[in-house]
């Protein structure tokens, strides 16, 4: 059970790291699937 929890925690950390790497990669609005690119970060477009 403890091994499973450690594995899940590691998987979550890897997913967050990959997500952050993708978020920081935007250079213009077309790089963000749904939102705007602001200073290299994809921000959600509200409204």
From Swiss-Prot:
The modification Phenylalanine amide is found at residue 46. GO terms for cellular component: extracellular region. Disulfide bonds join 26-37, 32-42. Residues 22-27 form a propeptide. It is found in: Secreted. Keywords: Amidation, Disulfide bond, Secreted, Signal. The keyword Disulfide bond applies. Residues 1-21 form the signal peptide. Expressed in salivary glands. Highly expressed in the head, body and tail with a 2-3-fold higher expression in the head. Its main location: secreted. Belongs to the annelide toxin family. Leech salivary gland peptide with unknown function. Does not show effect on voltage-gated calcium channels, potassium channels, and tetrodotoxin-sensitive sodium channels. Does not show activity on Nav1.7/SCN9A, and shows very weak activity on cation channel TRPA1. This is Peptide HSTX-II.
């Amino acid at each position: 059970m403890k091994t499973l929890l450690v594995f899940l925690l590691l998987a979550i950390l890897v997913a967050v790291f990959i997500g952050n790497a993708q978020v920081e990669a935007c250079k213009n609005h077309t790089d963000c699937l749904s939102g705007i690119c602001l200073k290299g970060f994809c921000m959600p477009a509200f409204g």
